[in-house]
Amino acid sequence: MSQTFGNSSKYLFTSESVTEGHPDKICDQISDAVLDAIIAKDPTAHVACETAVTNGLVVVMGEITTSCYVEIPELVRGVIKDIGYIKPEYGFDDRTCGVLTSINRQSPDIALGVNKSQEAKSGQVDELDLTGAGDQGMMFGYACTETPEYMPLPISLAHRLSKRLAEVRKNGTLPYLRPDGKSQVTVEYHNGKAKRISSVVIGAQHDPDITTEKIQADIIRNVIKPIIPTNLLDENTEYYVNATGRFVVGGPVSDTGFTGRKILVDTYGGFARHGGGAFSGKDPTKVDRSACYMARYIAKNLVAAGLADRLEIQVAYVIGVAHPLSVSIETFNTARMNHEDILSIIQKHFDLRPEAIIRNLGLRRPIYRQTAAYGHLGRPELDLPWERLDKVDAIKATIESLSVSK
């Protein structure tokens, strides 16, 4: 077997994704649906919405401070219906599930620092200093040249497979499929470049009267082959479709789900580091979310400008303070400029204060539910502000000026 991820010339790396009907992803979508509904009416609302689903029950809880009202049970049932849990025989559906809510206001101790940052309390008048970070912590962003969307290949393919699994269910190509499902892709790398697909794993929930043989043949033909590039497949590529032989009972009937349980699926599939904070259900004053988006935006624009083939950025904050505590980068020996100059470019072109992030990326808008399944990053089918490459020309101009000055 090949050596694992590291500095070896040949290694395997695996990432997974899940469909929108996975229990944890149901929760993410509900939490972000609540956030979108509130922020559409009250853009400055403070929202921290958590969801749990289990057999026949949805619980929505959290801390929300807002001037508006939204009908949460109605939102919950709408999300469940959109996903496809609409038949009683699934054991969980939009009409018969119970919905409980337990919502409190944001802690006034937290609000003290978020609503008025330490900088503002000290008399600074820059309006971008007014909003303090919603929590302490470190956040990471990453980009690489492996795919057109500047994402690692394993997670990119895994997301596309999971999304395709939902598509063939919804469009009737494979009408016997049910909403729950997972995918996993193992890529073999040679000298840091993707060489071939070692294995593809699909778990697809299905009706009880379909044979394993039919499911396996249908999934390979209608899901895997249309997604995986043929030049990466060979006679040694292994396919695992419903490896236990049966996947009838799924969704919240078989597994309890929670918001924020799929943080690597949401980001880089384990290819880059993660600070530990989840995204869904959080308004953009929570740097767990907004700073991760900003870090991705920075990394993607720097890589697209040719500064490195792989770049990871870490940003750290303290609650109630606008300016980050630290900013650091790792380029994995692919940089075409020293790290000090790259950091100076980041400082020149990207403002990492929470209010600046919110304004520059336009984050006080109902744009979040669409990110709650199939990845928050590297989504070419969505017009996500943190995926835009609108800083590349300015970065290149700065690179030229630095070269001239030296």
From Swiss-Prot:
Residues reported in the UniProt entry to bind K(+): 50
Binding site for ATP: 22, 180-182, 246-247, 255, 261-262, 278, 282
Pathway: Amino-acid biosynthesis; S-adenosyl-L-methionine biosynthesis; S-adenosyl-L-methionine from L-methionine: step 1/1
Main location per the UniProt record: cytoplasm
Keyword Nucleotide-binding among record annotations: yes
Domain of life (superkingdom): Bacteria
Positions of Mg(2+) binding: 24
Subcellular localization(s) per the UniProt record: Cytoplasm
Keyword field: ATP-binding, Cytoplasm, Magnesium, Metal-binding, Nucleotide-binding, One-carbon metabolism, Potassium, Transferase
Cofactor remark: Binds 2 divalent ions per subunit. Binds 1 potassium ion per subunit.
Reactions the enzyme catalyzes: L-methionine + ATP + H2O = S-adenosyl-L-methionine + phosphate + diphosphate
Cofactor: Mg(2+); K(+)
BP-aspect Gene Ontology terms: one-carbon metabolic process; S-adenosylmethionine biosynthetic process
Amino-acid positions noted as binding L-methionine in the UniProt annotation, renumbered to this chain: 63, 106, 255, 286
Family, similarity comment: Belongs to the AdoMet synthase family.
Subunit structure: Homotetramer; dimer of dimers.
PANTHER family per UniProt: S-ADENOSYLMETHIONINE SYNTHETASE
Protein name per Swiss-Prot or TrEMBL: S-adenosylmethionine synthase
Source organism per UniProt: Dehalococcoides mccartyi (strain ATCC BAA-2100 / JCM 16839 / KCTC 5957 / BAV1)
Lineage, broadest ranks: Bacteria, Bacillati, Chloroflexota, Dehalococcoidia, Dehalococcoidales
